[in-house]
C-alpha cells in the first residue's frame, strides 16, 4: 500500500518511455556530433530494431507435434495394456508404497506431507526469506525519499547567550592619578526564528533577536540611558542563487533521485519475486521428477528380482555360476540406483521446503514433501512478437534501465548548471526597536519610531578555467550515454531471453511425443518378450533372460526420458512467463508493495502466530 501523498509513485511500476525521451542519450559517434534528436531516436527504436525483421501481422499459433507413437502400429488392445502396465505416471506412488522412500536421516520411516503447486507458490510468496529481504528494499528507499524531502521542511531554531564582560579602559586624563577605568557589561541575547530551504536553491529565514544589556561604568565614565535596556530585531532574510544552483531542477535533484531509487527498489522487489516464484515452480517440478523416477527405479528393481530368480532356477539345467553372478550384480546395481533415487527425492523435498519456508515443515524437519499435481501435457498458444512486446512492457529490468537514464539525465542537468558562475543574491529587511523593557521595544516597532534596516547584496565567484565543473559535466554526459546503451542492452537481453524461452517451450513439447513413442516401443518389446516367455520354452533360456534384463533397462531409460521431457516442458512454460515478466499475473499474484508500517505490523503478527500455524499445518497434511 502506498503512503499518503505518494500514491502515484506506487500506483504503477511501469515507466513510460516518453518520460525519458527528452533526457535520453546514445553513443554512435563523437560527443560533439551527438544531437538530442538522435538520442531520443536511439531510445525509441531500441525495441523496433529487435523485431523489425519479424512478421508482426502473423497470428499466434498453437503448439503442434507429430504423432510419433502412431508409427509403431501397435494394436489398440496391446496399447491399452502398455499404458496400464508400463506408464511411469501410473506406477504405485511413495504414499501407496511407503517403503520405497527409504529411511530419513534419523533412521526412521519418513513422514510425508502432500503439497500442491499452488500451495507451494503461495507459501513462497508469503514466507520466502529472499522475498522478505527484498520487501524491505522499497520501505528503506521510502525512508530515503522522506529524508530527501525533509530538506525543505521548516526548521525552528532558538539560541540563548549570556555574557559578562569587565573591560579595562583608559582614564579620562583630566583627573591626576586616575589612569584607567573599568567598564562592566552584562548582556543576555535570545535569537528565535524559522528557516527553510527553497526548491529554487535558496533559503529563507525569519528571526527575532532580543538583546538585554546592563552597562556599569566606574569613575567618571558615562552610563547610557535607559540602562538596563532591551533591543529587539525582527529580521527577514532571503539568500538566492541566480546562476549556479538556481532552479528546481537543481534544488529537487536529490528528491528525484531518491524517488527513482524507490522505484528501482520496487522493480528489484518485482524481479526477486518473479525469480523466486519461478524457482519454486521449477523446484516443484524437480520434486515431481524425482518422485516419478523413484517409482521407475523401484519397478525396474522388482522386474529384475523376478529375472534373477528365474536365472537361479536354471542352475540345474543350463545356467552357469557366472550367469547367476551377473544377474545378482544387475539387481544390486538397481538397488544402488534406488538409493540414489531416494537421495534425490530427499534433496528435492528439502529444496522445495527451503523455498516455501513453511513453519509446518521447516528445512530442518524430516518431513518429506509428496507432490499432488501432475505435469500438464497441453499445448499453448504462442506469438513470438507478442511475447517480446509483453516482455519489454513487463520486465522489471527494463524499468530499471529507464530509471537509470532518468538518473543520469538529472545528474547531467545539475552538472550543466555547475558550469555557470556563482552569483548569489541576499535580501534582508529588519524591524528595530529599543527601550528599557521588551514590550515597549516591540511597541516602538509597531509605531515605526526607528528607521528599519534594509540590506541588498550580490556575491560573485568564478573559478579560473572552470576545469572541475567542465570535467564533471563531461563525465555526467558520458554516463547518460552509457545509460542509454545499457537500456538497449537490457532490451536486447530481454528479447534473447524470450526467444530462448519460446524455443524451449516448442522443442520440449515436441520431445514429449518422441519420448513417449520411445517408451511405448520399449514397453512393447518387453511385453512381447514376456509373452514369448510364458508361451514357449525358449523364453526361459539364460540368453533370453539376459535379453529381458536389457529390455528392462531400455524401458526404464525411456520412462525417465519421457518424465524428463514432460517436466522440462512445464519448466519451460514457467521460464517463458519469467522471461516475459508475467509470472505474477500467471499465478494470480497481486503485486502490492507494503510500506514500513505494514511490514512492522506483519512481523509482529508472524511472531505471535508462527508456533500455532506450524503445528496446525503439520497435523492437517501429514500422511
Q: Language-model segments: what does each one mean?
A:
Residues 2-13:
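Bacterial N-terminal signal peptides that target proteins for export
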Residues 12-23:
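Bacterial N-terminal signal peptides
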Residues 26-78, 166, 337-340, 350-380, ...:
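Acidic, low-complexity, intrinsically disordered peripheral segments
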Residues 90-123:
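Regulatory alphaC helix of protein kinase catalytic domains
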Residues 108-112, 160-236, 370-381, 412-417, ...:
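Small/polar, glycine/serine/threonine/aspartate-rich low-complexity segments that form flexible
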Residues 126-132, 139-154, 191-218, 224, ...:
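A glycine-/polar-enriched beta->alpha junction
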Residues 134, 138-148, 272-299, 306, ...:
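Amphipathic alpha-helical coiled-coil segments
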Residues 230-243, 247-337, 350, 355:
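Hydrophobic, small-residue-rich alpha-helical packing segments that form membrane-like cores
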Amino acid at each position: 500500500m502506498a503512503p499518503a501523498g505518494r500514491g502515484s509513485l506506487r500506483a504503477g511500476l511501469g515507466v513510460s518511455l516518453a518520460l525519458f525521451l527528452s533526457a535520453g542519450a546514445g553513443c554512435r559517434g563523437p560527443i560533439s556530433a551527438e544531437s538530442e534528436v538522435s538520442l531520443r531516436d536511439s531510445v525509441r527504436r531500441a525495441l523496433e530494431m529487435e523485431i523489425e525483421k519479424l512478421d508482426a501481422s502473423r497470428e499466434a499459433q498453437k503448439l503442434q507435434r507429430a504423432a510419433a507413437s502412431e508409427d509403431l502400429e501397435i494394436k489398440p488392445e496391446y496399447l491399452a495394456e502398455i499404458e496400464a502396465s508400463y506408464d511411469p505416471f501410473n506406477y504405485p506412488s511413495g504414499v501407496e508404497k511407503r517403503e520405497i522412500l527409504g529411511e530419513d536421516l534419523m533412521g526412521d520411516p519418513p513422514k510425508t506431507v502432500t503439497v500442491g503447486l499452488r500451495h507451494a507458490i503461495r507459501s513462497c510468496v508469503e514466507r520466502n526469506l529472499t522475498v522478505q529481504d527484498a520487501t524491505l528494499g522499497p520501505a528503506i528507499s521510502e525512508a530515503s525519499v522522506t529524508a530527501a524531502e525533509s530538506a525543505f521542511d521548516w526548521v525552528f531554531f532558538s539560541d540563548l547567550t549570556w555574557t559578562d564582560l569587565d573591560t579595562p579602559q583608559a582614564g579620562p586624563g583630566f583627573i591626576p592619578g586616575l589612569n584607567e577605568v573599568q567598564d562592566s557589561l552584562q548582556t543576555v541575547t535570545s535569537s528565535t526564528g524559522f528557516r527553510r530551504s527553497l526548491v529554487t536553491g535558496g533559503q529563507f529565514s525569519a528571526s527575532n533577536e532580543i538583546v538585554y544589556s546592563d552597562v556599569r561604568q566606574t569613575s567618571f565614565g558615562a552610563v547610557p540611558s535607559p540602562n538596563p535596556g532591551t533591543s529587539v530585531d525582527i529580521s527577514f532574510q532571503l539568500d538566492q542563487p541566480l546562476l549556479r544552483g538556481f532552479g528546481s531542477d537543481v534544488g529537487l535533484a536529490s528528491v528525484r533521485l531518491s524517488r527513482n531509487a524507490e522505484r528501482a527498489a520496487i522493480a528489484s522487489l518485482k524481479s526477486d519475486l518473479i525469480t523466486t516464484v519461478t524457482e519454486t515452480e521449477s523446484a516443484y517440478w524437480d520434486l515431481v521428477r524425482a518422485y516419478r523416477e523413484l517409482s521407475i527405479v523401484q519397478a525396474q528393481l522388482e522386474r529384475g528380482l523376478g529375472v534373477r530368480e528365474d536365472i537361479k532356477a536354471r542352475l540345474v539345467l543350463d545356467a552357469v555360476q557366472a550367469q547367476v553372478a551377473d544377474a545378482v550384480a544387475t539387481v544390486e546395481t538397481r538397488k544402488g540406483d534406488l538409493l540414489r533415487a531416494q537421495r534425490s527425492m530427499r534433496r528435492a523435498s528439502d529444496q522445495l521446503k527451503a523455498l516455501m519456508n513453511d513453519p509446518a515443515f521447516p528445512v530442518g524437519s524430516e518431513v518429506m514433501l509428496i507432490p499432488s499435481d501432475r505435469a500438464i501435457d497441453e499445448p499453448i498458444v504462442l506469438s513470438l512478437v507478442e511475447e517480446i512486446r509483453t516482455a519489454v512492457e513487463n520486465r522489471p529490468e527494463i524499468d530499471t534501465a529507464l530509471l537509470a537514464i532518468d538518473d543520469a539525465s538529472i545528474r547531467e542537468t545539475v552538472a550543466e548548471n555547475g558550469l555557470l558562475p556563482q552569483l548569489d543574491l541576499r535580501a534582508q529587511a529588519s524591524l528595530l526597536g529599543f527601550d528599557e523593557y521588551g514590550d515597549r521595544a516591540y511597541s516602538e516597532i509597531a509605531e515605526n519610531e526607528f528607521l528599519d534596516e534594509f540590506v541588498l547584496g550580490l556575491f560573485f565567484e568564478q573559478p579560473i578555467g572552470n576545469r572541475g565543473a567542465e570535467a564533471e559535466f563531461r563525465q555526467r554526459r558520458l554516463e547518460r550515454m552509457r545509460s542509454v546503451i545499457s537500456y538497449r542492452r537490457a532490451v536486447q537481453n530481454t528479447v534473447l531471453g524470450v526467444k530462448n524461452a519460446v524455443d524451449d517451450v516448442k522443442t520440449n513439447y515436441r520431445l514429449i511425443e518422441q519420448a513417449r513413442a520411445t517408451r511405448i516401443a520399449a514397453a512393447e518389446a518387453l511385453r512381447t518378450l514376456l509373452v514369448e516367455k510364458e508361451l514357449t520354452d525358449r523364453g526361459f533360456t539364460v540368453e533370453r533372460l539376459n535379453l529381458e534384463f536389457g529390455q528392462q533397462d531400455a524401458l526404464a531409460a525411456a520412462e525417465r526420458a519421457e518424465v524428463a521431457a514432460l517436466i522440462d516442458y512445464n519448466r519451460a512454460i514457467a521460464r517463458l512467463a519469467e522471461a516475459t515478466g508475467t509470472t505474477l499475473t500467471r499465478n494470480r499474484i497481486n503485486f502490492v508493495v507494503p510500506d514500513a508500517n505494514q511490514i512492522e505490523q506483519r512481523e509482529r503478527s508472524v511472531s505471535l502466530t508462527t508456533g500455532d500455524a506450524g503445528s496446525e499445518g503439520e497435523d492437517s497434511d501429514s500422511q
